[in-house]
Every structure is written in structure tokens, then in C-alpha cells.
Amino acid sequence: MRGQDPSRLIRPAAMAGLLLFALVGAALPQAEPAVQIVPALDRLGRADVRGQIPPLGRPITDDVRRMRNYPEQPPVIPHSIDGYQLTVNTNRCMDCHKPQFTEGSGAPMISVTHFQDRDGQVLTDVTPRRYFCTACHVQQTDVQPLVPNQFRDGYRHAGGP
């Protein structure tokens, strides 16, 4: 008979026991977790310290072309670019650096590689992947390095050691 089945009574009792165990366990003081969260590190290995961000360095605007530190290094921008518009529709750098404008502006011409797509096909205009100049070229600023520069290019210069 159905009224005689003892397993019907065990299920509610087991559930009540589990609930009591969970409540008592939650009320007990918890031990310190074994894993502790550490502060984030910045790229120099220092702990994350929130505070005032230092201003950018003063731009060098002498229009002197700088020597590159290694082959294939993109040249730095030796003039101010404050207010230059660089959008999908407008690139003010092209006003001076496109081949047809360099004679009048005296600016160096864009490398021919900027007119080649990824397959090596020469285009009539700057390839879209080279259109945003500041992705590779940066404005030179007068700042002290954050860390000492120990870069050695391994390239043997003619007449050098």
C-alpha cells in the first residue's frame, strides 16, 4: 500500500538535514581563503598605483629628421601634429607627404611601400592598411626614458665595429 512506503518519509527528512547543514555551515566563521588577490602590475613591474597621470612630454618641433635606431624603423614625426585631423575621410599628413605635394612642401615623400597592398600590388593611392600614420609613426617628444634603453640591433653598420 502506498501509505506504508517508508522511502516517502526519508526524502523530506534528508532535505531538512541538508538544509540544516547548509545553514549551520554558513553561520560558522569562514577561514581565510588560500588564494589571495595580488595588485595588478604595470609594464615596469610596479604595483598598480592610482594617481595623477603625468603630462605628455613637450613635442620636438625643429623639423630635423632623426636618425633611425634600426633598419625598418618607422621615422618619427619631427613636428607638431596637434589639431591634425586623421579620420577615415581626412588625413592631413597627406597634404604635405603625398608625392605630388612634396616639392612644394619640402616634406619627405611617403615610402612607395605605403602604396602597395598586402599582395604587393601597387595602388594609385595610399593603401588602407597604411592610411593611419600614427599607428606606426609617433611624434618625437623631449622626455627622459622611464627605463634605461639597452637595445642592441645586432646589425653591423659599414665601417663600424
Swiss-Prot record:
Pfam families: NapB (PF03892). InterPro entries: Multihaem_cyt_sf (IPR036280), NapB (IPR005591). It is found in: Periplasm. The keyword Electron transport applies. Disulfide bonds: none annotated. Electron transfer subunit of the periplasmic nitrate reductase complex NapAB. Receives electrons from the membrane-anchored tetraheme c-type NapC protein and transfers these to NapA subunit, thus allowing electron flow between membrane and periplasm. Essential for periplasmic nitrate reduction with nitrate as the terminal electron acceptor. One of its GO terms (cellular component) is periplasmic space. GO terms for molecular function: metal ion binding. One of its GO terms (biological process) is anaerobic respiration. The modification Pyrrolidone carboxylic acid is found at Q30. Gene3D superfamilies: Flavocytochrome C3, Chain A. Component of the periplasmic nitrate reductase NapAB complex composed of NapA and NapB. SUPFAM superfamilies: Multiheme cytochromes (SSF48695). Heme c 2 binds at H114, C133, C136, H137. The gene is napB. Binds 2 heme C groups per subunit. Heme c 1 binds at H79, C93, C96, H97. This is Periplasmic nitrate reductase, electron transfer subunit. Keywords: Electron transport, Heme, Iron, Metal-binding, Periplasm, Pyrrolidone carboxylic acid, Signal, Transport. The lineage of its organism: Bacteria, Pseudomonadati, Pseudomonadota, Alphaproteobacteria, Rhodobacterales. Belongs to the NapB family. Residues 1-29 form the signal peptide.
